[in-house]
């Protein structure tokens, strides 16, 4: 074993107290074989290679049962029995029963690794020193003076503030602190849903129904999907009778319906959800993902109201999907035709984001600026940002890389760099970096090499020479997601821990998703459907405490437009931002976004290799597998 110790297996007696008559078993980074040869007990039920515990640098580990007898892992209140060749992630404090009910060992991370500092501070600092330094250092360090795991631990937002930010999806096997304020599909689809429209690329009905039993009670369900013929036939056989399946038209080759959203109609209003996960098990349990949602009330039908930007963008996008109109009798509300214009019946004046969508086609004239990166360019050009964001860097983070060239990268960065400083001067071009997992990140991930199947970019796209200057590491210690491979897609402009704007989207880095200008920039060609939400520094304090699912009666202020919105600037920041009171307006509202990765990101070293899913990897992963299997 390596001389570096990452932790120990500490023997326990039947009362789960430390058994001092037996020695602790040291663990090193990488595979540790545990069995009869190094466990100081005499029991023939223990194999010589009873289990392999593969420890990662962050202290988490994967346990693989190698012997013929089962092993039990107790994590919190959960007790899981594993048979031969089954595996599970374990964390600090978990208890392993080498034989069920016998030979207890606690997995303990060494103190030097338990609370790793984020590029600031040392392991042997006194807590009081760290607290003093926390208040003394500027906010644009990377969480300086604050432990990595404290960042997501402190992300607690009241219900009325949730639409101002987004949330990460819950990841199985992570310690509790890493899932603070995270959500599962059951947290989203709940209550008395009358109509559900589920928009996605991949849909596994066999997983979806047990994962979200509330769907079985919804009278009208429309699934807008991007599945192929084989899966579609299975979906038709397995779906409920009241479900409608629809695949939107794809007029240009190599396009997909890739948008991930939900529209849930309630007696009191509509819930709009935009997220990054396919409707499959691994996406909602094993990946780093993001989700935004907001509830909106029905409009007062007796009061004429004009649409807002959010409403117009939403209805324009829904109209492009061309789903078959259907009738729905909504109890207490009446009969309705469920088509895109039905969604004009809700009041979106409190929307906290702008929609950035893509639809396939050759877009010209007024439509040139309605979709893709030209829509983002247009919205940003209408915005004013703090002067500190002039020439500030850009981040492109996604999970699939298209076939790109330098000309198109310049076209995209021109859109991403749009906007003006508060003195009316342009922000200017920002230098982009691409956050992309390395081969080693995938190999050591929660899923091992299998996690790379959801990062489906071929070597010919990834290993283009001009991309080398863009590569940056996926590091997510402060959210506990270093080993939860990213399927989330985000684009942002930042300075330190402050964000000029932030886009959570289904769009990967590809011409198919964002569009490519043609014909002397007079036409934008897009192949795919995409949808994202753009967070901007707002000059209005939005009333967004309306809920479709709580039991209280919404106040009048929450049912319609805000008559006297308080003018107040909002500042967007990461979870590791520290308020030094030096660069922040006292009257401004600070909105924390759970950006899962570290900013600024660490550039690739000469040893780092970007992941390509069609290469062969012979170094075994955390489950002892090679790639492809």
Regions inferred by a protein language model and the residue ranges of each:
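Short, solvent-exposed loop/linker segments at beta-strand-coil boundaries, enriched for Pro/Gly
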Residues: 69-72
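Flexible glycine-/small-residue-rich
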Residues: 65
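PLD/PLD-like phosphodiesterase catalytic module centered on the HKD motif
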Residues: 2-50, 54-57, 74-92, 97-629
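Short aromatic-glycine-enriched beta-strand elements
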Residues: 59-62
């Amino acid at each position: 074993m390596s001389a570096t110790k990452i932790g120990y297996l500490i023997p326990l007696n039947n009362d789960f107290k430390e058994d001092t008559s037996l020695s602790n078993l040291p663990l090193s980074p990488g595979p540790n074989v545990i069995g009869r040869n190094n466990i100081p007990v005499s029991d023939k039920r223990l194999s010589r290679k009873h289990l392999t515990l593969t420890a990662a640098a962050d202290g988490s580990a994967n346990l693989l049962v190698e012997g013929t007898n089962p092993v039990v892992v107790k994590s919190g209140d959960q007790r899981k029995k594993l048979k031969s060749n089954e595996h599970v992630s374990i964390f600090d404090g978990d208890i392993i029963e080498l034989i069920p009910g016998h030979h207890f060992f606690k997995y303990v991370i060494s103190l030097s690794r338990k609370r790793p500092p984020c590029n600031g501070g040392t392991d042997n600092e006194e807590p009081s020193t760290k607290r003093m330094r926390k208040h003394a250092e500027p906010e644009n360090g990377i969480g300086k003076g604050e432990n990595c795991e404290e960042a997501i631990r402190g992300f607690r937002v009241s219900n009325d503030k949730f639409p101002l930010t987004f949330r990460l999806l819950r990841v199985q096997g992570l310690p509790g602190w890493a899932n603070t304020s995270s959500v599962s599909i059951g947290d989203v689809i709940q209550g008395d849903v009358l109509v559900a429209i589920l928009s996605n690329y991949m849909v596994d009905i066999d997983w979806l129904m047990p994962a979200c039993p509330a769907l079985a009670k919804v009278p009208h369900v429309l699934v807008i999907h991007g599945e192929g013929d084989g899966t579609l036939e299975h979906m038709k056989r397995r779906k409920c009778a009241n479900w409608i399946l629809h695949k939107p038209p794809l007029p240009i080759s190599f396009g997909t319906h890739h948008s991930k959203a939900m529209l849930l109609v309630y007696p009191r209003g509509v819930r709009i959800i935009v997220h990054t996960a396919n409707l499959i098990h691994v996406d909602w349990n094993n990946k780093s993902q993001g989700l935004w949602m907001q509830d909106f009330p029905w409009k007062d039908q007796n009061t004429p109201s004009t649409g807002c930007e959010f409403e117009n963008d939403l209805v324009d996008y829904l109209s492009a999907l061309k789903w078959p109109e259907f009738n729905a009798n909504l109890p207490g509300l009446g009969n309705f035709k469920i088509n895109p214009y039905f969604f004009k019946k809700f009041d979106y004046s409190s929307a906290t984001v702008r929609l950035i969508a893509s639809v396939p086609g050759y877009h010209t004239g007024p439509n040139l600026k309605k979709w893709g990166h030209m829509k983002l360019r247009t919205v940003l050009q209408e915005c004013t940002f703090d002067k500190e964001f002039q020439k500030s860097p850009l981040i492109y983070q996604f999970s699939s890389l298209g076939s790109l060239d330098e000309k198109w990268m310049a076209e995209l960065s021109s859109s991403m760099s749009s906007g003006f400083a508060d003195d009316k001067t342009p922000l200017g071009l920002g230098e982009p970096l691409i956050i992309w997992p390395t081969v080693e990140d995938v190999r050591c991930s929660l899923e091992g090499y299998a996690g790379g199947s959801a990062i489906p970019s071929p070597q010919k796209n990834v290993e283009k020479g001009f991309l080398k200057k863009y590569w940056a590491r996926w590091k997510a210690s402060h959210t506990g997601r270093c080993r939860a491979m990213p399927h989330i897609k985000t684009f942002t402009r930042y300075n330190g821990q402050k964000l000029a704007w932030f886009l959570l989207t289904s769009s990967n880095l590809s011409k198919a998703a964002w569009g490519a200008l043609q014909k002397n920039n007079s036409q934008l060609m897009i192949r795919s459907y995409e949808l994202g939400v753009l967070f901007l520094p707002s000059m209005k304090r939005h009333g967004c405490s309306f809920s479709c699912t709580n039991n209280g009666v919404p106040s009048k202020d929450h049912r319609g437009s805000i008559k006297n919105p308080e003018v107040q600037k909002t500042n967007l920041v990461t979870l590791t931002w520290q308020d030094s009171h030096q660069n922040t307006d006292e009257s401004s509202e600070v909105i924390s976004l759970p950006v899962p990765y570290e900013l600024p990101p660490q550039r690739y070293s000469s040893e780092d290799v970007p992941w390509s899913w069609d290469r062969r990897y012979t170094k075994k992963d955390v489950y002892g597998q090679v790639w492809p299997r």
